[in-house]
Amino acid sequence: MDSSNCKVIAPLLSQRYRRMVTKDGHSTLQMDGAQRGLAYLRDAWGILMDMRWRWMMLVFSASFVVHWLVFAVLWYVLAEMNGDLELDHDAPPENHTICVKYITSFTAAFSFSLETQLTIGYGTMFPSGDCPSAIALLAIQMLLGLMLEAFITGAFVAKIARPKNRAFSIRFTDTAVVAHMDGKPNLIFQVANTRPSPLTSVRVSAVLYQERENGKLYQTSVDFHLDGISSDECPFFIFPLTYYHSITPSSPLATLLQHENPSHFELVVFLSAMQEGTGEICQRRTSYLPSEIMLHHCFASLLTRGSKGEYQIKMENFDKTVPEFPTPLVSKSPNRTDLDIHINGQSIDNFQISETGLTE
């Protein structure tokens, strides 16, 4: 086979993995050959925040166990150096000062290390005030233990309070549609805030990713607007919002959506919003493939009125689409419209709809 006739296929969007960003916003890209040295380990806080909860719990549990074991070894070494392991602690020699009472084995040393870190008082095992080495080691263990507990507590609070958790309540429609608005085609998707607390300063941006034959990804910005709002952001997000992209000849999607089976691309949508209570920015992402963009469809209605006149949101219709009925763009008269009748793909005749009925 002539290698010059072979196409170079980029591994980023191969036949097996056709999506860069999942529907819930996670990236599927994998870094092969990336070296994780000291520069990576310096960001220990970021590594912890990115960990899954099960790994985070494992790391924290291991940190406590290692801390207890290290100081258990130190307490055992102190008892060995002071000659306390072989003594009768109930009747010690008069000229001998026991540093820690009843540490006669490594098990006892580990128990004392655990007791020092987790309790506010001692039982039968306790350090002697006449042994400076024991007092110094006790102070070091307490200081490092408090630092470890503060770090772990802060990491738990930071992970729970991340704005990322608020973003999970933002929901995009599973599909986007291409429908006509004011006679012009528009790419449309909807987004909903599933929590009663509002979001403010909502911004939406989108990037179109296309794979070229040279193995590179080409990125194009796609602009979306919200109804008739002229500003770049929506000031209040409590009910579902509908975003539109006008498919004009200059639109990057114009040539891609002309056919029923367009070439592969991925449209990644980013929504950023501010939490009203905390002022923190959260971001939600999703992506749409060509198979997830429905031509000549529109979304079902979401807003209804209740018995008392209040607005109600029918979330069961959030992902529901209905076929778009074609509307004539040109009419011969205000009361007369041409209508072509097709049976099995064959044009039969031309009729006109008037106020009095169907005429030939």
From Swiss-Prot:
GO terms for biological process: potassium ion import across plasma membrane; potassium ion transport; regulation of monoatomic ion transmembrane transport. The record marks 149 as: Role in the control of polyamine-mediated channel gating and in the blocking by intracellular magnesium. It comes from the Eukaryota. Keywords: Cataract, Cell membrane, Disease variant, Ion channel, Ion transport, Leber congenital amaurosis, Membrane, Phosphoprotein, Potassium, Potassium transport, Transmembrane, Transmembrane helix, Transport, Voltage-gated channel. The modification Phosphoserine is found at residues 201, 287. Predominantly expressed in small intestine. Expression is also detected in stomach, kidney, and all central nervous system regions tested with the exception of spinal cord. One of its GO terms (cellular component) is plasma membrane. The chain crosses the membrane at residues 51-77, 132-157. Residues 106-122 dip into the membrane without crossing it. It catalyses: K(+)(in) = K(+)(out). Inhibited by Ba(2+) and Cs(+), although sensitivity to those inhibitors is much lower than in other Kir channels. InterPro entries: Ig_E-set (IPR014756), IRK_C (IPR041647), K_chnl_inward-rec_Kir (IPR016449), K_chnl_inward-rec_Kir_cyto (IPR013518), KCNJ13 (IPR008062), Kir_TM (IPR040445). It is found in: Membrane; Cell membrane. Residues 78-105, 123-131 are extracellular. Residues 1-50, 158-360 are cytoplasmic. It is a multi-pass membrane protein. GO terms for molecular function: inward rectifier potassium channel activity. Phosphorylation at Ser-201 by PKC strongly inhibits ionic currents, while phosphorylation at Ser-287 by PKA increases them. Belongs to the inward rectifier-type potassium channel (TC 1.A.2.1) family. KCNJ13 subfamily. It is linked to Snowflake vitreoretinal degeneration: Developmental and progressive hereditary eye disorder that affects multiple tissues within the eye. Diagnostic features of SVD include fibrillar degeneration of the vitreous humor, early-onset cataract, minute crystalline deposits in the neurosensory retina, and retinal detachment. Homotetramer. Interacts with RAB28; the interaction may facilitate cone outer segments phagocytosis. PANTHER family: INWARD RECTIFIER POTASSIUM CHANNEL, INWARD RECTIFIER POTASSIUM CHANNEL 13. Inward rectifier potassium channels are characterized by a greater tendency to allow potassium to flow into the cell rather than out of it. Their voltage dependence is regulated by the concentration of extracellular potassium; as external potassium is raised, the voltage range of the channel opening shifts to more positive voltages. The inward rectification is mainly due to the blockage of outward current by internal magnesium. This is Inward rectifier potassium channel 13. It comes from Homo sapiens.
